[in-house]
């Protein structure tokens, strides 16, 4: 059962439309579906709200600590409401997946994602769900860069091209059903639905 869905991103208008905020976009979509307005919750270091989704109450959270410090926000809300790590889904941008794809997995390393690294450190476990939203990689972009650290930072902190944005939005829409399946406790089925479309 899933009790908390966290979207990773950076706060502020200048970051709103950047690839690094794909997790925020998913949580915004869920908030609209659940008829919930996320409000500033200083004790949780972010914007939070309780939504009625898939016939159950689910907390939605957008940390306002900037990506690399997301763990403080996640652990604050999880501890307050006694939510276990395996009841948490963290949605984040994933450069190793093309724009328009999404993958669901439980546990594993951070894959170089500093937001996940910080969350794992604060939760003292990697045993939480990750919803990886593909945003592509600079080496695969038209006129693509080599993909060094500076190229990667520039890439994720820029808005996607129009066709990429459309593909990412469609991927987010495709995540909603499988997230509902996961929230009901059917993890294998949720992964199959998302990964195979069945």
From Swiss-Prot:
Instruction: Kindly state which reaction or reactions the protein catalyses.
Output: an N-acyl-L-alpha-aminoacyl-tRNA + H2O = an N-acyl-L-amino acid + a tRNA + H(+)
According to its UniProt entry, the function of this protein is described as: Hydrolyzes ribosome-free peptidyl-tRNAs (with 1 or more amino acids incorporated), which drop off the ribosome during protein synthesis, or as a result of ribosome stalling. Catalyzes the release of premature peptidyl moieties from peptidyl-tRNA molecules trapped in stalled 50S ribosomal subunits, and thus maintains levels of free tRNAs and 50S ribosomes.
Keywords, A to Z? Cytoplasm, Hydrolase, RNA-binding, tRNA-binding
Q: What is this protein called?
A: Peptidyl-tRNA hydrolase
Family annotation (InterPro entries): Pept_tRNA_hydro, Pept_tRNA_hydro_CS, Pept_tRNA_hydro_sf
Q: Which residues bind tRNA?
A: 15, 66, 68, 114
Catalytic residues in the record: 20
Q: Where does this one sit in the cell?
A: Cytoplasm
Q: Which GO terms describe its molecular function?
A: peptidyl-tRNA hydrolase activity; tRNA binding
Q: Can you tell which superkingdom this protein's organism belongs to?
A: Bacteria
PANTHER family in the record, alphabetically?
Answer: PEPTIDYL-TRNA HYDROLASE (PTHR17224:SF1)
| Any Gene Ontology CC annotation | cytoplasm
* Complexes and interactors: Monomer.
Which GO BP terms apply? protein quality control for misfolded or incompletely synthesized proteins; rescue of stalled ribosome
- Xref: NCBIfam families: pth
């Amino acid at each position: 059962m899933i009790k908390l869905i966290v979207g990773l991103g950076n706060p502020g208008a200048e970051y709103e439309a950047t690839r690094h905020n794909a997790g925020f976009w998913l949580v915004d979509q869920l908030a609209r579906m659940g008829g919930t307005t996320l409000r500033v919750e200083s004790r949780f270091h972010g914007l939070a709200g309780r939504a009625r989704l898939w016939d159950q109450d689910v907390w939605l959270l957008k940390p306002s600590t900037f990506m690399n410090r997301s763990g403080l926000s996640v652990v604050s809300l999880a501890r307050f409401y006694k939510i276990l790590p395996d009841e948490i889904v963290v949605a984040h941008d994933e450069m190793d997946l093309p724009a328009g794809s999404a993958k669901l997995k439980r546990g594993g390393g951070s894959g170089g994602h500093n937001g996940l690294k910080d969350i794992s450190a604060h939760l003292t476990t990697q045993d939480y769900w990750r919803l990886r939203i593909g945003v592509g990689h600079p080496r695969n972009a038209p006129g693509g860069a080599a993909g060094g650290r500076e190229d990667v930072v520039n890439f994720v902190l820029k808005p996607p091209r129009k066709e990429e944005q459309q593909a990412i939005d469609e991927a987010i829409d495709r995540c909603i059903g499988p997230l509902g399946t996961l929230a009901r406790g059917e993890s294998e089925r949720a992964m199959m639905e998302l990964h195979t479309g069945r």
